[in-house]
Each structure stands twice: as structure tokens, then as C-alpha cells.
Curated annotation (Swiss-Prot):
Potential multifunctional C-type lectin receptor that may play roles in endocytosis and phagocytosis as well as in cell adhesion and migration. GO terms for molecular function: carbohydrate binding; signaling receptor activity. This is CD302 antigen. It comes from Rattus norvegicus. The chain crosses the membrane at residues 166-186. It is found in: Membrane; Cell projection, Filopodium; Cytoplasm, Cell cortex; Cell projection, Microvillus. Gene3D superfamilies: Mannose-Binding Protein A, subunit A. GO terms for cellular component: cell cortex; filopodium; membrane; microvillus. Pfam families: Lectin_C.
Length: 228
């Protein structure tokens, strides 16, 4: 494969990886959103402390809007993230209209509450039970949380990327473009050199005299010398 074509493929691959829909490899894409599980235990005073773990990354606590999304989160939680049995959902109980709402302000169009859940209170939070996929109600007053599931819509807001990330991405792209151009130049010089080589090594022109004629001329010269 020509150097230029190979370099172009490398450039395309790197550009795709850098500018993928999700911020980085720790995020997982599903439908129109990206998800990441922050595997750290933090001490908290209220749910806002947990939520800050996500908002610091330009995201929010997870919201779930259909059965497919719930199943995806459950499957990824079990197989990839290895999260806790009870995962805090990004919802709160609004006493003004006596209903649960999502922190990310999306509509509450789906729920999966377990049948035995009881009365809703002002300090009631929602949890995803990882063994069954059902939602449970629990007290928002907690001292610590093991793992936080964050969600953000695509496209990810680039302002939350660090300066180092942007710098590295720029350097990678610039280096790849340079390699692509260099590869194209090398390939061009190689092709030109190959064409010149065919001309340089073309067969030498034949003498107008055959070997026999040359031998006769040589013998005549020798005979003349002997007469002298």
C-alpha cells in the first residue's frame, strides 16, 4: 500500500478516536447518551455531594427512560463496571407536586419500581437494584456512596475537557498530518526515482559494424604494418 494511503488511514483512525461521540474510553455509548461509572467511595452529607462527582465531568447522575436503557445499564453494571448492588439514581422527590423528577430535568417517562415500595417522603431517593433491575426507594441521608453512575447527552460539552487533553489531541493530529505529508513526498520521490532508473539502465546502442567487419579491419591494419 502506498505510504500516503497508509498515512491517511492512520490519520482517519486517530481523528475518529479523538473526536468520538463520548469523551474518552472510560465512557460507554448507548443510544444518544454516554455513561461512565466512577468507581470510588466518597463520604457525603447529602445527594448533592454525589451529584457533584458527575457535574465536575460535565454530566449528571444517571436518568433512565425506557426498558432498553435500564437493561443496558444493568448489563454493563454487572459485566464491566462491577458496581454495588444498589446504585443511586439521579432523581429526587418533589413535594410540590408529589412526584419523582430527574436531576437532569428530563421527563419522567418510565419507571421500574418494585411492587413492595411504600410511601414517598421528602428525603426519598431512588436506587437501581443490580440483581433484578428493579428500582427501590431509600433514604437520601447517607454517609458514604460506593460508585457513582454518570450520564451525559451526545455531543459531550468540550469545555469540560482538560487543557492537557486538548493539547495532546492537537499534537496527535498535527503529528499524523505531518507523517501523512511526509509519506506522500517519499512515495512521490520513490516513483520518480523508479521511472528514472528505467531510463538510466536502457541497453547501450549497438555499433554499426558487426564483429566480423571489425576483425577484417584489424587484419588489414596488421598486414599494412608488416609491409612497412
Amino acid at each position: 500500500m502506498p505510504h500516503a494511503a497508509l498515512s491517511s488511514l492512520v490519520l482517519l483512525s486517530l481523528a475518529t478516536a479523538i473526536f468520538a461521540d463520548c469523551p474518552s474510553s472510560i465512557w460507554v455509548q448507548f443510544q444518544g447518551s454516554c455513561y461512565t461509572f466512577l468507581q470510588v467511595t466518597i463520604n457525603v452529607e447529602n445527594i448533592e455531594d454525589v451529584r457533584k462527582q458527575c457535574t465536575d465531568h460535565g454530566a449528571d447522575l444517571v436518568s433512565i427512560h425506557n426498558e432498553e436503557e435500564n437493561a443496558f445499564i444493568l448489563d454493563t453494571l454487572q459485566k464491566r463496571w462491577k458496581g454495588p448492588d444498589d446504585l443511586l439514581l439521579g432523581m429526587f422527590y418533589d413535594t410540590d407536586d408529589a412526584s419523582f423528577k430527574w436531576f437532569d430535568q428530563s421527563n419522567m417517562t418510565f419507571d421500574k419500581w418494585a411492587d413492595e415500595d411504600g410511601e414517598d417522603l421528602v428525603d426519598t431517593c431512588g436506587f437501581l437494584y443490580a440483581k433484578t433491575g428493579e428500582w427501590r426507594k431509600g433514604n437520601c441521608e447517607m454517609s458514604s456512596v460506593t460508585g457513582t453512575l454518570c450520564k451525559t447527552a451526545i455531543p459531550y460539552d468540550k469545555k469540560y475537557l482538560s487543557d492537557n487533553h486538548i493539547l495532546i489531541s492537537t499534537l496527535v493530529i498535527a503529528s499524523t498530518v505531518t507523517l501523512a505529508v511526509l509519506g506522500a513526498v517519499i512515495w512521490f520521490l520513490y516513483r520518480r526515482s523508479a521511472r528514472s532508473g528505467f531510463t538510466s539502465f536502457s541497453p547501450a546502442p549497438q555499433s554499426p559494424y558487426s564483429d566480423g567487419c571489425a576483425l577484417v579491419v584489424s587484419e588489414e591494419d596488421e598486414y599494412s604494418v608488416q609491409l612497412d
